[in-house]
Amino acid sequence: MLSAALLLLPGLPLAGAGATEEPTQESGPLGEPPPGLALFRWQWHEVEAPYLVALWILVASLAKIVFHLSRKVTSLVPESCLLILLGLVLGGIVLAVAKKAEYQLEPGTFFLFLLPPIVLDSGYFMPSRLFFDNLGAILTYAVVGTLWNAFTTGVALWGLQQAGLVAPRVQAGLLDFLLFGSLISAVDPVAVLAVFEEVHVNQTLFIIIFGESLLNDAVTVVLYKVCNSFVEMGSANVQATDYLKGVASLFVVSLGGAAVGLVFAFLLALTTRFTKRVRIIEPLLVFLLAYAAYLTAEMASLSAILAVTMCGLGCKKYVEANISHKSRTAVKYTMKTLASCAETVIFMLLGISAVDSSKWAWDSGLVLGTLFFILFFRALGVVLQTWALNQFRLVPLDKIDQVVMSYGGLRGAVAFALVILLDRTKVPAKDYFVATTIVVVFFTVIVQGLTIKPLVKWLRVKRSDYHKPTLNQELHEHTFDHILAAVEDVVGHHGYHYWRDRWEQFDKKYLSQLLMRRSAYRIRDQIWDVYYRLNIRDAISFVDQGGHVLSSTGLTLPSMPSRNSVAETSVTNLLRESGSGACLDLQVIDTVRSGRDREDAVMHHLLCGGLYKPRRRYKASCGRHFISEDAQERQDKEIFQQNMKRRLESFKSTKHNICFTKSKPRPRKTSHKKKDGVANPEATNGKPPRDLGFQDTAAVILTVESEEEEESDSSETEKEDDEGIIFVARATSEVLQEGKVSGSLEVCPSPRIIPPSPTCAEKELPWKSGQGDLAVYVSSETTKIVPVDMQTGWNQSISSLESLASPPCTQPPTLTRLPPHPLVTEEPQVPIDLSSDPRSSFAFPPSLAKAGRSRSESSADIPQQELQPLMGHKDHTHLSPGTANSHWCIQFNRGGRL
């Protein structure tokens, strides 16, 4: 767009370049043949216009690079000042060589091509919440302030002429000075943006000044057109209805421009909703429709700046949610590049245009009077308007803010382009107005731009400390918004918070569902996004710590705006796409067919696994037990399970079941000896081994540390408290070892319980008996967190595990003797009667209890009640209390089919 825009640069023979006469072949004398084929031909006129445009942009870019080579220069002098000075130098060189000014800033080039990218960039990336929070102050300064500055400056200059302080050769009346006051009083958005972005004042002050420079365009356009029409008509022909039409045109131009921008914003958001399969055209649609809004408003004589500002401000929320991450990046950098190039060309052409002395005439009284009046009336208007606004603002604007606002009223290329558009036949003093405008622009951009940063430092103005708000800040901000809206609703006052709350409800109910893609609308909740990220991180940690080939780099954690839906980036899908063998939910993958059902299933499992179920509320009753037994039991079980998870989170799990201390870890020597009593699955009945599932080939290990190790790693545990429970899947042969590992690494072996009796399936299917040991290491320290009153719930949980296996055989079970543990003294085994309590889940042999007493005599005072909930009702007498701080290996022989 910028390249096409600069094709209309003044001084370039663009029309002539396109319409150059084709060379005619001059024939020689009669009968002579035409000249032969030329090997080389210079065709400068065919490429002159685009070549010069490319050269200007290249020179401007190289100049910016040179300026930023010295950090000291750019920290003291604004970039806009350096570009204007560069334009003056280049204009002087061109004037000295060509003896005339070749290049100038034409109004058509400026308004149609150079200004739109700057305004679009400002409106699209404007903080909408901050803008609408200060909308009242912005409109006050933009409308009332601009009207005040225009009329007071024009009347004061007319009075100055009547007093004889302006030369008589300046032939201008009251309408002429009002016309000049309307174009010179508007704050320029390009100059404000160029200067204040380098000063870094606080966001409230910046949004008020910059918002004023954007919204005062409607007032400037109306005043300029009305005064220009009055000048062309003549003061004698102006009637009362013309004044009324001028007032009405203010509302038509401003509201019409805003309406045009909102219509194109709606079309842009609606169009990007259906670009999921053609992502490549998304950036093109953004620029085309925004530029179409500007041209439409300009065509209808409405405020084009206001139209493109409202278009960018209104469509960003929906467009950012619909387009892809790459498209957002392309839109951002393309828009910034176009705005930077246009701003650079504008300031350079301002400097070049000032060299041409044939288009301006000098009058000291007019120039000095204009400088004084625009500064004085600007400061007076800011003080009066701020006093009125502070009567209603919760956070008033202090005197320091008023000084910066008064000093920050910069004028720029908008005023220069408007004064160039004046008709010299209708306005005889045009040359004097042009010279005065150039001086005012140079003074505000160079002098005020150079001194505003030291002024801000001297006044100690609050600087901007922009940072991404945390989740806590966002929660409190939303809470305060709802509270203030509720207070206004209660007292019956429909204020700002009430209407903002109503707008948010309307947007959520209608606009977002219409203009945003369904997947984008469902995932835009920031609180849910945080929960989603935490679950993804836990899943990555689970896969990484579980010993699988997949590492944490194999799972990419997408950002919130970049993913299309939760189902597309769920943990299960990430594992499947990366070729992982781990599957978090097999049933979801096997049964779900539609994307919506898959998304709901994944979210259901995530919420059920990480959140408490809602507590039931019961009405008060006169009875002692008014809660039903089933509900109370279910809630107690859930609380117990959640407490178990939290306690286990404080323990550090490792990949090889090793207890780390502060000393440097050393590699552990694994034992390759086979356990006695375990059948070899490779030669069962002379058949090849079958394809075993993960429950038949590996054991699930829960690594739990002792109290000493927990204290030594307390600092590391606090840093990793949000990683969740980590399950380490390893082969059983790697778990059992023969002795201690050298150094501070130690494997804590534990005795095993007697396996349950073989089932009918194992009797009928011989290969079922070769499953191996499936052991679960659980520290007896965890039994301390089991309350005594939860014994029934624990036994029911153990019974539910047994119920998953095949039905037991009707024949009486044959009890086998356990082989002696490598680290436990072998003693004669005593058979244990399991028929007394069929619900008992496990039992400890007396020999192991005696071994426990021999190892830890000092802990004999620990009460037996601590281990009671983990045992059956009839097995308490076989346990020694001296084993409370030991590690136990509890083996559950699961069935071959679940």
From Swiss-Prot:
| Principal subcellular localization | membrane
Show the ranges annotated as biased composition (Basic residues).
663-675
Compartment list: Cell membrane; Recycling endosome membrane; Cell projection, Dendritic spine membrane; Synaptic cell membrane
**The name this protein goes by in its record:** Sodium/hydrogen exchanger 5
- Molecular function terms from GO: arrestin family protein binding; sodium:proton antiporter activity
Instruction: Summarize the record's disruption phenotype note.
Output: Deficient mice are born at normal Mendelian ratios without gross abnormalities in postnatal development. However, deficient mice display significant enhancement of learning and memory accompanied by an increase in the number of hippocampal excitatory synapses in the hippocampus.
**Where in the body, by tissue, does this protein show up?**
Highest expression level is detected in brain. Expressed in hippocampal neurons (at protein level).
**Topological region Extracellular:** 70-76, 128-137, 198-203, 271-279, 356-363, 423-431
The answer to whether the entry has keyword Ubl conjugation is no
Write down the chemical reaction(s) this protein catalyses: Na(+)(in) + H(+)(out) = Na(+)(out) + H(+)(in)
Q: Which residues cross the membrane?
A: 49-69, 77-97, 107-127, 138-158, 177-197, 204-224, 250-270, 280-300, 335-355, 364-384, 402-422, 432-452
Q: From its record, what is one biological process in GO terms?
A: regulation of intracellular pH
